[in-house]
């Protein structure tokens, strides 16, 4: 493990900073920075689009939090470098070196391209691109070894996140669990969610419960869509989609528990999941890995929302593993005399 150290020089004072690796890439390259989107809330009106983005940054460093910046691109609009703020509603996970930040964006409506019309409300889809930067990195004279500093920052500059944002209104959930208060023109909105951790599934486990979510306002779910993408043991990637109208009304703080809406079975010949009324949920007996994306459309209070959540799954030990068999291995204790045998049964 290589710890990189630089010194910042300002007004003849030296401040020493370090950055340690947070993971290895292909067991060779040490990676010093990682990032993912934790949560996105979006809203659009006739003049502008509003976004509140919570980011999970993974780093092992004593850099002050105001060192981290990001540039955002959405549609035909792009931002300058925006300082990231520490998220007040998320505590850092110091054990796993994860720190939470947020940014609030205002994007002119004219920069967005109208994609399609929803039957209840108009919505817009755009790809959001996030690139990360370190503050002050261009001021070479501030650093005792700028080339080393540039090495420290290189992983950050190469980290680019792309997410599809749906406006009118959208909540995107990428973490397994959390609680949030609305941050965009509806501060009274509160919601919480949980998704099961399917990343280390046993031989007979299946992906069934997709998400549990509740709001502090009345909810009417009108549509549910699920997309499952998975890679079978032969390396082929497949996708399965299920979309259905839905009528489900919830009281404030009542939990909506969504299981996989239709039954499936795994075809051992084609190595594919097929819809089967006599089947189960997502079950890959020969192993594999993948992810699912949920898209809920619902009226929450007096607002219409699109709620998108993603989760991943992987089998640690498949059921139909040709390397193993279904027989018990019995190890018999040797009996050397009738006297010993007599002792054993007394």
From Swiss-Prot:
Family annotation (InterPro entries): DUF5443
One Pfam family recorded for the sequence = DUF5443
This chain belongs to which protein, by name? Uncharacterized protein MG285 homolog
